[in-house]
Amino acid sequence: MVRAKSWTLKKHFVGYPTPSNFELKTVELPPLKNGEVLLEALFLTVDPYMRIAARKLKEGDMMMGEQVARVIESKNAAFPTGTIVVALLGWTTHSISDGKNLERLLAEWPDTLPLSLTLGTVGMPGLTAYFGLLDICGLKGGETVMVNAAAGAVGSVVGQIAKLKGCKVVGAAGSDEKVACLKKYGFDVAFNYKTIESLEETLKKASPEGYDCYFDNVGGEFSNAVTSQMKKFGRIAICGAISTYNRTGPPPPGPPPEVVIYNELCFQGFIVTRWQGEVRQKALRDLLKWVSEGKIQYHEHITEGFENMPAAFMGMLKGENLGKAIVKA
């Protein structure tokens, strides 16, 4: 019998999550049936969306999330022992699957790249950047792009794709170390929003002519400031609002209506699961190619040990990670 450890939601979050919100449980998994596989987690992801998605869980449910896993026992010919897969299996060390929810690595995945990238730059965050920028914003060469949380898993890819497409990129991050990383990635302007005197003046200095596209990972007052400096017919892709996820009071006011109206701005929220099938596979191949060629750089913030899943999650929500937050099981 295999014993699986799982992190569950003990109590719903109020404000920032704390260790008391989580409980580690151990269960014995049943023997495999025909068509099933037994999976062992290798890497697990913690992402901002989990803070909001957890509202739909019942107390006692396992926390949700993707992981990279290895098949360690198989009664399914499509997934022999040793196969590496990516799947939404939750915060658990071991799982049983019938194979329907499992995604194999891209056939061209090189041995030189870490498997954990399938949870970051060549996974859900990278796809979010890809489709949010190219489809939602409809990015064109020569435009000016603003992205916040720019040193994170999504924002760092947004900026680098925009540079690949011939755009000017301005990025905001929350530490000098992160700003240095953005400059290494080729951002034209990068600033630490925690140490500047005026966000409005910093944005204006970075791009006096304004912004064509804004990729919003943060929401709140920051986004209102950017909205006021968008160009005519500017496009805003609303990916996240991490600045508001842990609020206990009322949400901040939205952008000035007159700015939205008279500049004819387009706001669109989106969830990356919209894109499936071949269009998704093409995006993954593009991302893998760019990473393999060194055109997109990446940084991972890896926490060792499955027992540290809650700590990694809480640290990510407070911006302690540089790049993609990953847990190595």
Swiss-Prot record:
GO terms for molecular function: 13-lipoxin reductase activity; 15-oxoprostaglandin 13-oxidase [NAD(P)+] activity; 2-alkenal reductase (NADPH) activity; leukotriene B4 12-hydroxy dehydrogenase activity. The modification N6-(2-hydroxyisobutyryl)lysine is found at K178. InterPro entries: ADH-like_C, ADH_N_2, GroES-like_sf, MDR_fam, NAD(P)-bd_dom_sf, PKS_ER, PTGR1. It catalyses: 13,14-dihydro-15-oxo-prostaglandin E1 + NADP(+) = 15-oxoprostaglandin E1 + NADPH + H(+); 13,14-dihydro-15-oxo-prostaglandin E2 + NADP(+) = 15-oxoprostaglandin E2 + NADPH + H(+); 13,14-dihydro-15-oxo-prostaglandin E2 + NAD(+) = 15-oxoprostaglandin E2 + NADH + H(+); 13,14-dihydro-15-oxo-prostaglandin F1alpha + NADP(+) = 15-oxoprostaglandin F1alpha + NADPH + H(+). NADP(+) binds at residues 152-155, 178, 193, 217, 239-245, 270-272, 321. Optimum pH is 7.5. Its main location: cytoplasm. GO terms for biological process: leukotriene B4 metabolic process; lipoxin A4 metabolic process; prostaglandin metabolic process. The modification N6-acetyllysine is found at K178. It is found in: Cytoplasm. Ubiquitously distributed in various tissues and leukocytes, the kidney and liver had the highest enzyme activities. The modification Phosphoserine is found at S20. Keywords: Acetylation, Cytoplasm, Fatty acid metabolism, Hydroxylation, Lipid metabolism, NAD, NADP, Oxidoreductase, Phosphoprotein, Prostaglandin metabolism. CDD domains: leukotriene_B4_DH_like. GO terms for cellular component: cytoplasm; cytosol. Belongs to the NADP-dependent oxidoreductase L4BD family. NAD(P)H-dependent oxidoreductase involved in metabolic inactivation of pro- and anti-inflammatory eicosanoids: prostaglandins (PG), leukotrienes (LT) and lipoxins (LX). Preferentially uses NADPH over NADH as cofactor. Catalyzes with high efficiency the reduction of the 13,14 double bond of 15-oxoPGs, including 15-oxo-PGE1, 15-oxo-PGE2, 15-oxo-PGF1-alpha and 15-oxo-PGF2-alpha. Catalyzes with lower efficiency the oxidation of the hydroxyl group at C12 of LTB4 and its derivatives, converting them into biologically less active 12-oxo-LTB4 metabolites. Monomer or homodimer. This is Prostaglandin reductase 1. The lineage of its organism: Eukaryota, Metazoa, Chordata, Craniata, Vertebrata. The gene is PTGR1.
